[in-house]
């Protein structure tokens, strides 16, 4: 019953939003001049971004966008994949309809990005095993970001 009530109130979205706020406030948000330093945050956020909303069509205040709204509105982080591919939607999971894996960095580090992509090839394309129902090699695709640190 509690789980259904939480689902009805989008509790998972709100919880993840509080988590990202805590993470950002206690890392990049706790440092003076962080926007001028080399900072990076990446991973499976299990949430969608307003930068991809042309793909999803959520209303502006939808809770599914809370996590990345916080990052984009309250930190100096840049979404590396979307910034390198502004007119293209590149999914990061096997269902091909969602991007929930992100690489963020500050401008001084972003300026050193040579290339960035989500890798879809014969090896990385997720395949669901009919016996175990697990994805091989993973249900998420690798994200490759190449930096010139010279």
Locate the predicted segments by residue.
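Short loop/turn segments at strand-loop or loop-helix junctions that form parts
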Residues: 1, 43-46
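Surface-exposed cleft-lining segments at the edges of enzyme active sites
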Residues: 1-20, 54-56
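Soluble or luminal CAZymes and related metallo-dependent hydrolases
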Residues: 11-24, 62-64, 137
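Internal, well-ordered alpha-helical scaffold/interface segments
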Residues: 21-25, 43, 69
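Metal-dependent phosphoester-hydrolase catalytic domains
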Residues: 29-40, 47-150
């Amino acid at each position: 019953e509690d789980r259904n009530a939480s689902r009805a109130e989008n509790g998972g979205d709100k919880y993840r939003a509080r988590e990202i706020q805590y993470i950002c406030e206690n890392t990049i948000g706790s440092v003076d001049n962080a926007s001028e330093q080399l900072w990076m945050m990446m991973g499976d956020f299990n949430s969608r971004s307003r930068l991809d909303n042309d793909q999803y069509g959520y209303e502006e205040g939808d809770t599914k966008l809370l996590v990345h709204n916080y990052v984009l509105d309250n930190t100096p982080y840049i979404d590396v994949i979307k910034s390198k591919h502004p007119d293209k939607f590149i999914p990061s999971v096997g269902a091909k309809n969602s991007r929930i894996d992100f690489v963020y960095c500050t401008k001084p580090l972003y300026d050193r990005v040579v290339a960035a992509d989500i890798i879809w090839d014969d090896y990385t394309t997720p395949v669901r095993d009919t016996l175990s129902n697990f994805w091989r090699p993973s249900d998420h695709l690798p994200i490759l970001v190449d930096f010139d640190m010279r």
